[in-house]
Amino acid sequence: MEPQTKDPDPLPRLVHIGEIQFNLGEVTTGGVTPRGTFIFCPITGGHFTTVFPLPDGFGIHSEAIEGLRAEVLPGGGDYPLIHNNELAELNVSVVAKGLNNDHIFRITSFGICEWNKLIFDMMGQTAAARSTEMGEINAWQVFRINTDSPEYAWLNWACIIGQERLIYEDSRMAKTHMKLFQFLVK
């Protein structure tokens, strides 16, 4: 067996910076396209938070004196494409408004959710349907955030990845909750 070579460059790391939750409305199924079945899932609300203080080695200047607390406003949505009833290609667009400031945060994301028995149980409303824990489903999103907030301007340049869990309430997939991680290269 050949020895593995060690990469001389430092490896990037993920640092927990916050959380986001989307409250989901009733899904509308569209037709089949060459890339998959189109559906629309309205986002009716939720919340977005960041930690404070920011982790060591963060590297982006922040004027924040507290963690962000923001409300996800109704009117956004997820516009996924479903591939072969096995995979959802996620495409989210929402707006949040700061609760501890009056600034607006435009949040977009894309990602993947591989469907497994837990998700099929939720969609079929079976007796086994339940909320998932982090890591039980292969679901992730990459976020882009735009804001006019000087305190949270660092979000405009942050490379953010979300690890997802699904919340089952009232006999349906009612919410999606994500831990947010900043991708740091040093």
Curated annotation (Swiss-Prot):
GO terms for cellular component: membrane. Part of the gene cluster that mediates the biosynthesis of PR-toxin, a bicyclic sesquiterpene belonging to the eremophilane class and acting as a mycotoxin. The first step of the pathway is catalyzed by the aristolochene synthase which performs the cyclization of trans,trans-farnesyl diphosphate (FPP) to the bicyclic sesquiterpene aristolochene. Following the formation of aristolochene, the non-oxygenated aristolochene is converted to the trioxygenated intermediate eremofortin B, via 7-epi-neopetasone. It is a single-pass membrane protein. It is found in: Membrane. Pfam families: DUF3237. Pathway: Sesquiterpene biosynthesis. Its main location: membrane. Keywords: Membrane, Transmembrane, Transmembrane helix. It comes from Penicillium roqueforti (strain FM164). The chain crosses the membrane at residues 24-43. This is PR-toxin biosynthesis cluster protein 7.
